[in-house]
C-alpha cells in the first residue's frame, strides 16, 4: 500500500503550521463528531482526522443532506480512491450551495495539512443544512438569513422616486422662519446683561458674534486735514482728527521754501564758478516771501553799478515864452 510520507516542518513552515494548529477548536470538533454521527449513523472514532481521511463518511453525509449527490463511494484502502472520495465530496457540497472560500482542499484533510479549514467547512455545511430545513438535535452552525424578495408595481416605483430617505441625510426640520430679507437692519444684544428680550427676529445675540461696539464716530471724511502730535510730549490732541506719532510721522515736513513748479533753478559750484549774477534760490532757508517761493532783496545781486543820486544842472530854461508871431521851425 502506498503512503504519502511527509517530513517534519522547520523554520517558517513550522511556525505557520503551529499558528494554524493553535486556531483549532476542540469543542467544535466534538460538536461536529456528534452531528455527523447523528446524521450518517456511522462512528468516526477517537481520531477525527483519521476517521474522515478515506472520504467514505463524508460522501455518506452529503448523500443524507442531498440524496444522490455522490453516485459511487470507493471503499478501497488505497490512497487514490480515498482522494477520489474527498474530491467527490467537495464537488457535491459546491452543488449544495457552499461558498468556494469556505471549502477546504483535499490535502488539508488527507495529509493533515490544515484541519482548521476542514473544521470551518463542516461547520458552514451544518449551518447551510439548517438553513435549508435539515434539523438535528445538535445545534451547530449558523442559520443563514432567508432572502426576502419583494415586487413592486410601476406606480409604487415611480412614487418612490420623489421621496428622500433619511439615509440621504436630514436637515433636522430646518426652515427659513425668522430669517430677515437682504439689507434689513438687525440689532445686537447681550443675553448676559439681563436686558430685555429682542422684540423680533431681527435682533442678533452676541453669542452669534459681535463687532465690539464698533462705530464710525471720530472718523474724518476723505480729504479732511488731520494733525500730528507726539504722545511722549504730553500734548493733548485737539480733536479726533489728530494722528499720533505711533501711527507714523513725516517729521513735520512742509512745502516751505519750495519753488513754484516750472521756475528755473541754476546749479553751480562756488569753487569753480564765479558768483551768479542772477537771483539765487535757496531751499527755503532764506527769503522774505510768505510761502518761501519769493526772492528777497539780499538774494539778488544787481549787474549794474549804483545809480547816480545827485542833481542834474538846469542848462535849459524850463519854461519858454513864445509870442504870437514866434514859432519853431522844424
Curated annotation (Swiss-Prot):
What ranges cover the Calponin-like repeats?
A: 164-189, 204-229, 243-268
Task: Using the record's annotations, give every residue carrying the modification N6-acetyllysine.
Answer: 23
PROSITE patterns for the chain: CALPONIN_1, CALPONIN_2, CH
GO BP annotations of the record are: actin filament organization; actomyosin structure organization; epithelial cell differentiation
Locate the region Disordered: 279-330
MF terms (GO), sorted A to Z: actin filament binding; calmodulin binding; microtubule binding; protein-macromolecule adaptor activity
Q: Is Acetylation one of the keywords UniProt gives this record? A: yes
User: From what superkingdom does this record's organism come?
Assistant: Eukaryota
Q: Where, per the database record, does this protein carry N6-methyllysine?
A: 158
Pfam assignment, any one: Calponin
The Calponin-homology (CH) domain covers 26-130
User: What keywords are annotated for this sequence in UniProt?
Assistant: Acetylation, Actin-binding, Calmodulin-binding, Methylation, Repeat
One of the record's GO cellular component terms: postsynapse
Q: Which InterPro entries match?
A: Calponin-like, Calponin/LIMCH1, Calponin_repeat, CH_dom, CH_dom_sf, SM22_calponin
* Compositional bias ranges of the Basic and acidic residues kind: 306-318
Q: What does this protein do?
A: Thin filament-associated protein that is implicated in the regulation and modulation of smooth muscle contraction. It is capable of binding to actin, calmodulin and tropomyosin. The interaction of calponin with actin inhibits the actomyosin Mg-ATPase activity.
Q: What's this protein's family per the entry?
A: Belongs to the calponin family.
Q: What is this protein called?
A: Calponin-3
The source organism is Rattus norvegicus (Rat)
Amino acid at each position: 500500500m502506498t503512503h504519502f510520507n511527509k517530513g517534519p516542518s522547520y523554520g517558517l513552515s513550522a511556525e505557520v503550521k503551529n499558528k494554524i494548529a493553535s486556531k483549532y477548536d476542540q469543542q467544535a470538533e466534538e460538536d461536529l463528531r456528534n452531528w455527523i454521527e447523528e446524521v450518517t449513523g456511522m462512528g468516526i472514532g477517537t481520531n477525527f482526522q483519521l476517521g474522515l481521511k478515506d472520504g467514505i463518511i463524508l460522501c455518506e453525509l452529503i448523500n443524507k443532506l442531498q440524496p444522490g449527490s455522490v453516485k459511487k463511494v470507493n471503499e478501497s484502502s488505497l490512497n487514490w480512491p480515498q482522494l477520489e472520495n474527498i474530491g467527490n465530496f467537495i464537488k457535491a457540497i459546491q452543488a449544495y450551495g457552499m461558498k468556494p472560500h469556505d471549502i477546504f482542499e483535499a490535502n488539508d484533510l488527507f495529509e493533515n495539512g490544515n484541519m482548521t479549514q476542514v473544521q470551518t467547512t463542516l461547520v458552514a455545511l451544518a449551518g447551510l443544512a439548517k438553513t435549508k430545513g435539515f434539523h438535528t438535535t445538535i445545534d451547530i452552525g449558523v442559520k443563514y438569513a432567508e432572502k426576502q424578495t419583494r415586487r413592486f408595481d410601476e406606480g409604487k416605483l415611480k412614487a418612490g422616486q420623489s421621496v428622500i430617505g433619511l439615509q440621504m441625510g436630514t436637515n433636522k426640520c430646518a426652515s427659513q422662519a425668522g430669517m430677515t430679507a437682504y439689507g434689513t437692519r438687525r440689532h445686537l444684544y447681550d443675553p448676559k446683561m439681563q436686558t430685555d428680550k429682542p422684540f423680533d427676529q431681527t435682533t442678533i445675540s452676541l453669542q452669534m458674534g459681535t463687532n465690539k461696539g464698533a462705530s464710525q464716530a471720530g472718523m474724518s471724511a476723505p480729504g479732511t486735514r488731520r494733525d500730528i502730535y507726539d504722545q511722549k510730549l504730553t500734548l493733548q490732541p485737539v480733536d479726533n482728527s489728530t494722528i499720533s506719532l505711533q501711527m507714523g510721522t513725516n517729521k513735520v515736513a512742509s512745502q516751505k521754501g519750495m519753488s513754484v513748479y516750472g521756475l528755473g533753478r541754476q546749479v553751480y559750484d562756488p569753487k569753480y564758478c564765479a558768483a551768479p549774477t542772477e537771483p539765487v534760490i535757496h531751499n527755503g532757508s532764506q527769503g522774505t516771501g510768505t510761502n518761501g517761493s519769493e526772492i528777497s532783496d539780499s538774494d539778488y545781486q544787481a549787474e549794474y553799478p549804483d545809480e547816480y543820486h545827485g542833481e542834474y544842472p538846469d542848462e535849459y530854461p524850463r519854461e519858454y515864452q513864445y509870442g504870437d508871431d514866434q514859432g519853431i521851425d522844424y
